[in-house]
Amino acid sequence: MITTTARATKTVLIVDDDQAIVRLLKEALGLFRHQHAYKIETAGDGADALAALHRDQFDLVLLDMYMPRMTGLELLAQMRHLKLQTPVLMLTGNDDTRTAADALASGIFAYIPKPFDLQHLEHLVSLAVSSRSTPASR
């Protein structure tokens, strides 16, 4: 599903099998007060996200760790294999430090345990999309 605001300047892929989290993230992105507006695409698992990444370019991926068909870490490995430089914020209910270290070693921008603070998420989203030197480049 794709949602676009009238002045969308950045494209975000939300990957999570929990539709309540997807709705929360979509709503939050619409409320953030920094200079960007977002075109949002969603995927319910890593396999659908991989198809979206083949089809489109994104400025940011918000990624759940544990999903059916392909985990977040498996998707990250595929993204790196494709040489995608898209910043990834990994959102997870797992607060295990080893898992966080593995995710960070995979090249994610930030590891965010659930439940997360929306102000903290807003700050990280702003930093991540601003870290790109060119819009939606591979």
Feature-to-residue mapping (PLM):
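C-terminal output helix
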Residues: F116-S126
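Short, conserved "switch-loop" micro-motifs in signal-transduction and mechanochemical regulators
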Residues: L82, N94-D95, S106
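Two-component/phosphorelay signaling modules centered on CheY-like receiver
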Residues: Q19-E41
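Receiver (REC) domain active-site loop signature in two-component systems and cognate sites
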Residues: M67
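Active-site beta3 strand of CheY-like receiver
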Residues: D56-L62
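Acidic catalytic/metal-coordinating carboxylates
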Residues: D45-D48, T71-E74
